[in-house]
Amino acid sequence: MSTLGSFIWSIADQLRGPYRPNQYGNVILPFTILRRLDCILEPDRETVRDLAAAYENPNRLRIQVKKATGRPFYNTSKYSFANLLKDADGLEDNLVDYVDRFSPDVDVFEYFDFKKEIIALEKAGLLREIVKSFGAVDLHPDVVSNADMGDAFEYIIRKFNEAANETSGDHYTPRDAIRLLVDLLFAEKDADLTEAGIVRTLYDPTAGTGGMLALAEEHLLAQNPDARLSLYGQEYNPQSYAICKSDLLAKGHDASNIAFGNTLTDDAFKGRQFDFCMSNPPYGVDWKQYAKAVTKERDEAGPYGRFAPGLPATSDGQMLFLLHLAHKMRAPEDGGGRAGIVMNGSPLFNGAAESGPSNIRRWLLESDLVEAIVALPTNMFFNTGIATYIWILDNNKHPDRKGLVQLIDGTSFWTKMRKNLGSKGREISDTDRAQILRLYADFTDADPDFSKVLRNDEFGYWTITVERPLLDECGKPVVDRKAKPKPDSKKRDTENVPFTYGGSTAGPAGKAEVIQSYFDTEVKPHVPDAWIDWAKVKTGYEIPFTRHFYKYVPPRPLAEIDADLDKQVAKILDLLREVEG
């Protein structure tokens, strides 16, 4: 996957003994970042030291450094990898001084608790060798591109997570999946993105190490070198946050746009909206510890709050991020926004009518926010083989797509990898990606075997409660004081009635007529004494993705099966004769 990543990880062999394998990343990751920044800063080190001597005010210094070097960050220490080893006795103190003298926006090493690791390495007698090993690797962007550096981080993090046996729900997003998501996200806006000097904002509330942000920028600049994409993100894992922030720093972005913290309980960009939003939240990871704060926000924010439509079960927080993204899209009156999110299959169908998940789907569909859902191949992620889906949201749809949702079955568009990377044995090649994008672009003209376009109301249904009378010992209905038959709770049943039953296109407005028609046709002929409890009718929405792409495979003819059985029986009899003979 990454020759550089493999080489850097091999440095961890020096840590054997004092460190366990699941602790290697605590050393390797911050040293990799430090060396990358060290190489970037090297050409202007003397200039920055002179400026630091002339300007004591940090804000003035930052402005002058930006003017002189073009970079928003700097380091004023007299030490670097070039001279750290010259003072063997002072290595620990000098390295700490070097880390301490980065500009205030370079706070990434605090999130690794890096000083503690420096002290531990010195005590173990390993610090000199580690510094020497990293000093021998040139990580300057002219030598190692941002893409290659991203691959190296991806490799190191995967090795670290394998050793640490990280939570299965926390998945590093492979680059082939990100590229597809980015292409789909920008697909409807490609014409706009070629305008001269455009400025667009992109936001990832689960930024991880910044892979999505980096590839989105790469995509935009490939289309329009003069475009400027302002990147924003938030990340709760300290190490991932540090990597993401340092990567953006290295590229010259405003590091203050990357925030540390829990997006669900403390939105660092509250009140902000963005042109493009994207996320790959953890799958099936519970949010019980945040439930109190999330519920409080839902109750206090009112009907327009981000969690107002509903809350999913505390066992899986994916749909909270889905709601969050929907509220982060730029308002339609300001040009609208688009969002892309990768999730597993649960958000498509989990939860009964009027449950939290169903109400979230209802809000998204009745608000006409869901533009497309793409099923990805299985075995796409490094530590899980589960089925995953890309949801594309748009609050300002193209007129042809209004009121419609496109489902794309991309499960067969994959290429086998030469070598598995954990659970990842498949990748979406450029050709595979182009085929999926063609299906998206063709829309209603796309191959129906792989693409379906449905009205929003086709995902809706009503759950009706069907009652039957309670009978006395003589078999007669028991009635209440108003002479109405009492229901028998043991015979109570429920039925799901699609909005579209009987060819209805009225959607929610057809409730009474469609339900009555369904009841008269599907229920009454079988249980003539039944009735509907109209007070218990519930509205639900689900997206039965696989059902829409189900292909009936008829069973083999009986004669063919019998012939096969006869052949097998004959073989067994021949073997028995050989044994007896």
For the regions a language model picked out, list residue spans one by one.
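Conserved catalytic motifs of ABC-family nucleotide-binding domains
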Residues: D286, Y290-S315
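Flexible, glycine-/basic-rich loop-and-beta segments that form/coincide
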Residues: Y290, F382-D472
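Conserved Class I SAM-dependent methyltransferase catalytic core
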Residues: Q14, Q23-R36, L181, Y241, ...
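Active-site lining segments that contact anionic ligands and/or coordinate catalytic metals
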Residues: Q273-F274, D316-Q318, D334-N344, V370-E371, ...
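Conserved S-adenosyl-L-methionine
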Residues: S168-S279, Y283-K296, M319, N344-S346, ...
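Short acidic (Asp/Glu) and glycine-rich catalytic loops that position anionic groups and cofactors
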Residues: V131-K132, N161, D254-I258, D299-G305, ...
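Feature representing long, continuous alpha-helical segments
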Residues: A214, A242, S279-P281, M319-L323, ...
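Non-catalytic, mostly N-terminal accessory regions of nucleic-acid modification and defense proteins
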Residues: M1-D190, N257-A268, A375-T378, K402-D409, ...
